[in-house]
From Swiss-Prot:
The organism of origin for this protein: Methylobacterium nodulans (strain LMG 21967 / CNCM I-2342 / ORS 2060)
Protein name stated in the entry: UPF0102 protein Mnod_0024
SUPFAM superfamilies hit by this protein: Restriction endonuclease-like
Family to which the UniProt record says this protein belongs: Belongs to the UPF0102 family.
HAMAP family membership: UPF0102
GO molecular function annotations of the record: nucleic acid binding
A Pfam family matched in the record: UPF0102
PANTHER family, per database record: UPF0102 PROTEIN YRAN (PTHR34039:SF1)
Length: 129
């Protein structure tokens, strides 16, 4: 069996590509709202942040979720994901000390087929260390 014949490998690749597409769509939606990208797929401290965006004095750490429905996307951010996300956000802040004086928040963008992405401001609190 070749790699392309493996159904599990095909599913993983499709999921990976769907995630990248959702992140690009989320980025476009946020750009149209006046945000500037600072980082994409920032990984550190056992967590990952899909997008780090800035608008004025706000730094938004953005989790992008693509699911069949917007409600399913919202439900996909569980406590474990929030903890890992918060660890990565603290690592990003430590590497960018200039950001400490700005408003920092955790946003989410939910993406569903044939729908414009939904941006949820302050979707959850960044957990302290």
């Amino acid at each position: 069996m070749t790699r392309t014949d493996d159904p599990a490998a095909r599913r993983r690749r499709a999921t990976y590509l769907r995630g990248h597409g959702a992140e690009r769509l989320a980025l476009l939606a946020l750009l149209l709202k006046g945000y500037r990208p600072l980082a994409r797929r920032f990984a550190a401290a056992g967590g990952e942040i899909d997008l780090v965006m800035r608008r004025g004095s706000v730094i938004a750490f953005v989790e992008v979720k693509a699911r069949p429905t917007l409600d399913a996307a919202a439900a996909a951010i569980d406590a474990r994901k929030r903890r890992a996300f918060s660890r990565a956000a603290r690592a990003w802040i430590a590497r960018h000390p200039w950001s400490a004086g700005l408003t920092l928040r955790a946003d989410a963008v939910f993406v569903a087929p044939r729908r414009w992405p939904r941006h949820l401001v302050s979707a959850f609190d960044l957990e302290p260390s």
